[in-house]
């Protein structure tokens, strides 16, 4: 019987060591790569700017806007001087510039290749005039808006210190509903620095309610108002309800 024996090669060496300089070269290559990446990272903005050959020069105002026009956006952008290109221009300062418009609640700015901007704005919505030359939102934010752009008609006239704006709106809603339920229309209210309330009716009569609880005073007004005797050549200027009972009525010539 012939038995085949497998010969073990004697010339094969396992785990052959590589020259020491190989590790030095590898470490140097890794270090070189790290320095390259750091250089790119810290000079990324300048690299992108050099790649830009067309500064941003156009924009699109998207969405439905009640007060903001393309001219408003154009004027805001022109204040920033010449913009950079698609890669180099940061949109954050553009967004801040647009949000500086007093009636703009917020803005979203996106870059569009190769040299355009897409701009969307959110606007404050006025529910009333505030101190004659301003406006106020439902949640009490006071802002400015050119009155010629106002589309809503017959807004109420509210007034007071700005920090009281939300309280004034809440009180207005209550007073308006209260009087309307008695077929009396109001067009505005005001609170002064001392916390005293005044209500202006649509016929320009002023109700002086003073400080504190105004509900009982309104009830008294609703009761006595139809009983006031007004001479033919006179009209009611104000009704002072700052008393525990009754009221003082001021009249002027027609």
Swiss-Prot record:
Intrachain S-S bonds: none
Pfam families for this protein: FtsQ_DivIB_C (PF03799), POTRA_1 (PF08478)
Domain called POTRA: residue spans: 54-124
Stretches that traverse the bilayer: 28-48
Segments in the Periplasmic topological domain: 49-254
UniProtKB keywords: Cell cycle, Cell division, Cell inner membrane, Cell membrane, Membrane, Transmembrane, Transmembrane helix
GO biological process: division septum assembly; FtsZ-dependent cytokinesis
Compartment list: Cell inner membrane
Topology versus the membrane: Single-pass type II membrane protein
Chief location bin: membrane
GO cellular component annotations of the record: cell division site; FtsQBL complex; plasma membrane
Role according to the record: Essential cell division protein. May link together the upstream cell division proteins, which are predominantly cytoplasmic, with the downstream cell division proteins, which are predominantly periplasmic. May control correct divisome assembly.
Subunit structure: Part of a complex composed of FtsB, FtsL and FtsQ.
Name by which UniProt lists this protein: Cell division protein FtsQ
Species classification: Bacteria, Pseudomonadati, Pseudomonadota, Gammaproteobacteria, Pasteurellales
